[in-house]
C-alpha cells in the first residue's frame, strides 16, 4: 500500500518532465452538481498563559507589524495571521508554470475526488482538506471527510484524518463535500474543523511520535456508526481533543462545515456553521451562537456572542473571524450570516471553569441597510430582492475593515459589494463608518487581498477586480473563464487566482493591468492559492500542485 501511495506524487524530474502519476485520473469536466445553480459548496481562509490572565509583553500592534516577517516562511493559517489579509511576504515566486512540461513544477500530489480546502503549510508539512474519492487506506471505502498531510519537500503522503459522514439528511453534511475548512497550525498543534462540525486539536506529527492523549479513541472515531473500533495505523491522525459544535454549542448545521480557527494566545475563535434546515426557510437552532471561543489547551467552551444572529441567518454561518488592534483595543471582526460586520472586544482573561462569558460587541455595520430585514426566508430564490449575507472573511488593514457582502450565491439577489469600513468608531456605525462601497459582479464569497495601496478581489461574475484601497475607485478588471469561489493571493508583486473552470491566472499586482500568464489545470478550483518557502501551493478538485521557480 505504501508503494502505491508514493506513486500518487508526481515529481519534477531533472529534465523538467513529469514522471508517472500512478492511480487516479485527471478530471476536466466540472460536475453538474457543482455548476452555478447546483448545491456544491465553496471554500468559502500566541503568547504564554500565566494563571488566569494572559500577559503580553507588547501590544498587538507590534505583533501585527511583526507577524508577516515572523510567518513569512510558512503559511500556517487562512490568510495573514490575525488580519486575514490574503497576501504573502514570499519573494522569488514564478510568474508562469506548466504541468504538461514540468516547467516550475516541484511536485504534484493526488487528493480526493472533490476538494474545496485551501492548503496550509507549517513545520515542513502541507495540510489540505478533501474527500475520500481516491482512498489512501483501503479500509475506508465510500464517502468520508479527509484532511491530508504531505511532506513539504517532495509531496510524500504522511498521514490523514478520516471522518465518517453524519448520514441521514444530506443538507447536514453535503455528499462528497469532504473537509472544506483550512486548518490553523501553531507549533506542533493543528486546529481543524471536521465535516461533522467538530473543532479538533491534532498532533502535526500524526502518529509518528505515538498516540498522545488525552483523547485515545481515534479508532472508534474513524469507525463512526459502524460501531467497534478500527486499528490506529501510522498513517492515521492523532487527535488530542474534540469540541462538538452540534452537541456542545447547540447548533443546527447546514450543507458543510466551514471555519478557519483564529488563534489568539490561549483562545480559539470559531464561527459555528449554524444555518437553515433542508427547507431553507427555517432556523432550527435560533438560540445557537454564531461565534464561539474555546480554550486552546482543552477545547472547553469559554465564550460566545450574544447578538442573537441565528434568526437573521440567511443561509449559514461560514465567515471566519479576523483580528486587529484599534485605539489600543484588541477587536475580533466577524462577518455575520445576516450581512452585518460585528467588532467584538477580544477576551482578556480566561473565564472560570463552568462559566461561558458573553462577547462584548463594540460596533456593528450593516453592509446592506436597504435589504430585506423581515421574513427573510420568504425571499429564498429571489434573484432581485433578498437579504444579504457574508461568506468571505473581513480583512483588517490600517484601521479599516474590508469585506465583501451581498445576495446569497444560491438563493439571493444578484447584487454584491466590496465595503471599506472605518474600524475606529463604536455602536451602530452603519451610517457613519463607510469609507467607500464598490459594486462587484453577481455574487462574491471571496476574501480581499490588500497590498501596495490596492485591493484585489474575485467574484462569481468570472472577474478579478483591482480597486484603490483608499478611495474604492476601480483600477482594472480581468475576466477569466470560470466563476471564482476562492480568493486572490498577492505575493511578490503578483496576483494569483484560480477559477471553477480550472484556469489559473497570474497578473501583475499594479494599478495598470498586466496579464503574466494563464494556465489550464486539471479540474475546477474552489480554493485559494497560498505561498510558503518560495513555493506556490494550489489545490484543484483532484490535485495539489507545488509550484516553484526552477533554478537558473
Task: State each model region's role.
Residues 19, 53-54, 85:
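Residue-level detector of intrinsically disordered terminal segments
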Residues 31, 39, 65, 69-71:
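Intrinsic disorder/low-complexity segments in short proteins, especially the signal peptide
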Residues 52-67:
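Bacterial N-terminal signal peptides
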Residues 7, 17, 21-38, 42-43, ...:
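Intrinsic, low-complexity polybasic segments
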Residues 6-8, 32, 40-43, 51, ...:
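Generic low-complexity segments that are intrinsically disordered, proline-rich and/or Lys/Arg-biased
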Residues 68-552:
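Noncatalytic, solvent-exposed loop/strand surfaces
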Amino acid at each position: 500500500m505504501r508503494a502505491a501511495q508514493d506513486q500518487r506524487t508526481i515529481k519534477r524530474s531533472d529534465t523538467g518532465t513529469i514522471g508517472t502519476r500512478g492511480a487516479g485520473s485527471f478530471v476536466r469536466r466540472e460536475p453538474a452538481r457543482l455548476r452555478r445553480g447546483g448545491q456544491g459548496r465553496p471554500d468559502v481562509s500566541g503568547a504564554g498563559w500565566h494563571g488566569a490572565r494572559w500577559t503580553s509583553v507588547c501590544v498587538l500592534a507590534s505583533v501585527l507589524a511583526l507577524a508577516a516577517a515572523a510567518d513569512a516562511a510558512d503559511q500556517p493559517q487562512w490568510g495573514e495571521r490575525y488580519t486575514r489579509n490574503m497576501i504573502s511576504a514570499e519573494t522569488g515566486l514564478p510568474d508562469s508554470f506548466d504541468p504538461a512540461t514540468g516547467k516550475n513544477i516541484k511536485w504534484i500530489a493526488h487528493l480526493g475526488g472533490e476538494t474545496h480546502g485551501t492548503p496550509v503549510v507549517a513545520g515542513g508539512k502541507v495540510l489540505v482538506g478533501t474527500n475520500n474519492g481516491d482512498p489512501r487506506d483501503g479500509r475506508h471505502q465510500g464517502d468520508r471527510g479527509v484532511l491530508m498531510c504531505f511532506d513539504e519537500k517532495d509531496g510524500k503522503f504522511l498521514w490523514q484524518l478520516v471522518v465518517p459522514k453524519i448520514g441521514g439528511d444530506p443538507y447536514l453534511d453535503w455528499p462528497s463535500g469532504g473537509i472544506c475548512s483550512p486548518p490553523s497550525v501553531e507549533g506542533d498543534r493543528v486546529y481543524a474543523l471536521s465535516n461533522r462540525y467538530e473543532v479538533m486539536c491534532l498532533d502535526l506529527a500524526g502518529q509518528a511520535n505515538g498516540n498522545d492523549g488525552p483523547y485515545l479513541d481515534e479508532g472508534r472515531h474513524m469507525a463512526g456508526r459502524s460501531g467497534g473500533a478500527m486499528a490506529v495505523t501510522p498513517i492515521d491522525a492523532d487527535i488530542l481533543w474534540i469540541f462538538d459544535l452540534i452537541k456542545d454549542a447547540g447548533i443546527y448545521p447546514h450543507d458543510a462545515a466551514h471555519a478557519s480557527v483564529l488563534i489568539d494566545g490561549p483562545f480559539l475563535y470559531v464561527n459555528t456553521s449554524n444555518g437553515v434546515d433542508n427547507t431553507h426557510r427555517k432556523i432550527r437552532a435560533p438560540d445557537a451562537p454564531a461565534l464561539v471561543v474555546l480554550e486552546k489547551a482543552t477545547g472547553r467552551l469559554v465564550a460566545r456572542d450574544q447578538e442573537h444572529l441565528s434568526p437573521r441567518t440567511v443561509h449559514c454561518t461560514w465567515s471566519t473571524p479576523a483580528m486587529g488592534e484599534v485605539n489600543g483595543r484588541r477587536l475580533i471582526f466577524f462577518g455575520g450570516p445576516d450581512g452585518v460586520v460585528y467588532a467584538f472586544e477580544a477576551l482578556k482573561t480566561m473565564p472560570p471553569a463552568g462559566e461561558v462569558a458573553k462577547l462584548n460587541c463594540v460596533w456593528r455595520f450593516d453592509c446592506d441597510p436597504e435589504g430585506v430585514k423581515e421574513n427573510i426566508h420568504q425571499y429564498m430564490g429571489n434573484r432581485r430582492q433578498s437579504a444579504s449575507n457574508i461568506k468571505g472573511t473581513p480583512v483588517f488593514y490600517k484601521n479599516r475593515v474590508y469585506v465583501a457582502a451581498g445576495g446569497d450565491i444560491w438563493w439571493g439577489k444578484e447584487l454584491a459589494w466590496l465595503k471599506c469600513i472605518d474600524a475606529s468608531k463604536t455602536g451602530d456605525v452603519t451610517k457613519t463608518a463607510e469609507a467607500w462601497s464598490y459594486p462587484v459582479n453577481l455574487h462574491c464569497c471571496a476574501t480581499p487581498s490588500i497590498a501596495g495601496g490596492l485591493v484585489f478581489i474575485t467574484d462569481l461574475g468570472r472577474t478579478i477586480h483591482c480597486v484603490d484601497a483608499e478611495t474604492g475607485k476601480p483600477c482594472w478588471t480581468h475576466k477569466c473563464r470560470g466563476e471564482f469561489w476562492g480568493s486572490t493571493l498577492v505575493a511578490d508583486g503578483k496576483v494569483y487566482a484560480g477559477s471553477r473552470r480550472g484556469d489559473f491566472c497570474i497578473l501583475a499586482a499594479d494599478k495598470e493591468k498586466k496579464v503574466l500568464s494563464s494556465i489550464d489545470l486539471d479540474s475546477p478550483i474552489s480554493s485559494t492559492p497560498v505561498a510558503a518557502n518560495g513555493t506556490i501551493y494550489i489545490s484543484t478538485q483532484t490535485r495539489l500542485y507545488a509550484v516553484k521557480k526552477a533554478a537558473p
